[in-house]
A protein has these predicted regions:
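Hydrophobic membrane-insertion alpha-helices, especially the h-region
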Residues: 16-34
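Aromatic-capped interface at the extracytoplasmic side
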Residues: 30-44
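Soluble "head" domains of membrane/secretory-pathway proteins
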Residues: 2-15, 34, 48-218
Length: 218
């Protein structure tokens, strides 16, 4: 009898630990998806604002509430399927192209929630819905006015970035975003405007290295 009780107690202990671990994993996944998560800068497209190998904390509350970002916000979003839109594709639509998401519930969860095999870009919001964006003579014009971009390095000019999206109206429900390192950034100049539902997070603070820890100014 005593041996049976010990076995039952051991099984109960194991089950309690398993349940605790499962609950902790669920909480961690939900927190990462809806609230925030860390990430590492892996490309130079946002230099000098963000440098490679810096650690950032991403605020996902903006996606959770489906709030439109503001001009100057640094965001992350799902990388479009088509890297460069042709002139004929732009005439059809200036919105970035994405493949149809997995129809299988498990595949959709793995891709969208766990973000396994998902590629994301980090860029700065430049144009907002309804605004007329023109890239001309190395400058960016919004509704006919040159925008001030103090975050760019001195001497940086904005060309077409090997793309054709240089004179257009930003469609409703989308944003136009570019990297601060304009010469080394594949961005909305190439693949078009990003739908709000594809925006994953807003960059909030640098968390590493410690000498640059803090909120990122626009």
């Amino acid at each position: 009898m005593e041996e049976n009780k010990e076995k039952i107690n051991k099984v109960k202990d194991i089950l309690e630990w398993v349940i605790c671990i499962v609950i902790a994993l669920i909480i961690a996944i939900l927190f990462r998806y809806y609230i925030g998560t860390p990430t590492i800068v892996k490309q130079p497209s946002m230099y000098p604002t963000l440098k490679e190998d810096q650690r950032l904390w991403l605020n996902r509350w903006q996606r959770t509430t489906k709030t439109m970002p503001k001009r100057g916000d640094i965001i992350t979003f799902e990388a479009p399927t088509t890297t460069v839109l042709s002139t004929s594709e732009i005439k059809e639509s200036i919105i970035a192209r994405y493949e149809i998401e997995p129809g299988n519930v498990v595949d959709s969860f793995v891709y969208n929630v766990l973000e396994i095999n998902k590629i994301s870009y980090i860029k700065r919001v430049i144009g907002l819905p309804g605004e007329h964006v023109v890239i001309k003579d190395g400058k960016v014009y919004i509704d006919g006015e040159i925008i001030d971009e103090p975050y760019l390095q001195s001497g940086v000019v904005t060309d077409n970035g090997k793309g054709y999206c240089t004179d257009f109206i930003v469609p409703e429900g989308t944003v136009f975003a570019m990297g601060d390192n304009r010469a080394q950034s594949t961005d909305c100049r190439c693949f078009g405007c990003i739908p709000l539902e594809k925006i994953e997070s807003k960059v909030w603070i640098r968390i590493w290295p410690l000498n640059v820890f803090g909120k990122i100014d626009k």
